[in-house]
């Protein structure tokens, strides 16, 4: 196949030997993740047939005898072109909650003939949701003042944030308030974020920014010195496992949920050790 979501495909197949092409951003994710050790065969994978804007080189894919393409549901026109050439195309969407993520894994399991593995993963998702649902009454009892304001960065340099979808869903589930944009604003600005004054900031692996860059106010053109999360040293770099944990369609999303929950509401989510959870998962699964 040629695809987005190589981390999910690897998780279901247990190998990456049949991956023909992945986007450059997915390749950079491979370089920084444990997938580099688990799937060294991706070192020489093509990154020119599927672009970071998810457009594809239809002719090149046909010449490469690709028998399946996985891409986002925004690429319907190219999917039709591929189908006209006899290349099946599975279109996926960004999960907005854990049910959406389960549906995605099930669909990929069917497409890749990995139904049993997919069922194992969705059972894990169900167990995770059962755990969070068991905390629902405690979370519901929180006052607004007890729910910290949370900002999830996608890319700090570009000032792009996760303002909706599954990350907002998760933040609410664990007792936080996720940053959202006012209706009349389409892109976040420093002014908008300063007005929001996040108490917790999560930064993804789509850039090289570290918490220390915030604490030492090193980010060019941005002054974070008066932001609560920075003053209280509550800026966190999101881990990277098989792939970056922050994006919506990440296989290890339950680990992301438990990791962020232990930061957002440490008193409620205190009945597990996140390092043990992470270590046990990778030992058991791989």
Q: What do these predicted regions represent?
A:
Residues 130, 161, 168, 191-198, ...:
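A residue-level marker of the well-folded mature domains of exported/periplasmic proteins
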Residues 2-60, 68-70:
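A short, structured surface patch at a secondary-structure boundary
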Residues 160-185:
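Alpha-helical, coiled-coil/dimerization segments enriched in small aliphatic residues
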Residues 185-237:
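A contiguous binding-surface segment within folded domains or other stable secondary-structure elements
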Residues 3-6, 25-28, 68-69, 74-77, ...:
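Solvent-exposed loop/turn segments at secondary-structure junctions
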Residues 21, 71, 92, 181, ...:
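Short beta-strand and adjacent tight-turn residues that come in two discontinuous sequence segments
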Residues 48-52, 58-71, 87, 190-206:
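Proline-aspartate-enriched helix->loop->beta-strand connector
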